[in-house]
A protein has these predicted regions:
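Small-residue-biased structural context
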Residues: 1-171
Length: 171
């Protein structure tokens, strides 16, 4: 993930968003299966780490400080992304639905990012307005992110304990 000069939580999360957007763009134009697989694996790693630090650190700090509907939707959107990530991880380029799964994940993430980054009413704007200590949160998130990247690179990504729409057992 991109390094930032600050430990601000929102800046860190936005940098993650930009990185993943770039990876999705590269996937869209990739031709070779080996390149598609490498990009999809990187997308899944980046999103899994990002989701984990949001759910473990940022979202709990936002609880009660932002609109409940926005907070709830963020968790549900993460659940959908986790299922799609597990599907992508279980497959390979050339498999039926593989490219479609990456495309749908990209669309889900674009929607999620839009909800978080909306100028006035998005999650990040509401968190700032509520006075969250984004520097302290960011420092904690950056440390957790570093540890998770090392862990997931060594042992693989965690799988959600649900069957997918194609019947793949994900746990």
């Amino acid at each position: 993930m991109a390094k930032t000069a600050t430990t601000d939580a929102i800046a860190l999360l936005k940098a993650d968003h930009r990185k993943v957007e770039g990876l999705f763009e590269q996937f869209e134009s990739a031709k070779a299966d080996s390149r598609k697989k490498a990009l999809a694996d990187q997308i899944c790693l980046e999103l899994t780490v990002h989701t984990k630090i949001e759910e473990d650190i940022f979202y709990p700090a936002c609880n009660g400080k932002i609109e409940d509907d926005l907070w709830h939707e963020a968790y549900v959107e993460h659940d959908g992304a986790k299922v799609m990530i597990a599907e992508i991880e279980a497959g390979k380029p050339g498999d039926e639905f593989y490219d479609a799964k990456v495309k749908v994940l990209s669309e889900q993430i674009k929607h999620h990012v839009k909800e978080e980054e909306k100028r006035a009413e998005g999650m990040f704007a509401q968190a700032k307005a509520a006075g969250l200590d984004t520097e302290a949160l960011g420092a904690k998130m950056a440390a957790e992110k570093k540890a998770l990247v090392a862990k997931y690179k060594a042992s693989g990504l965690p799988k959600p304990p649900t069957p997918s729409f194609t019947g793949t057992r994900l746990a």
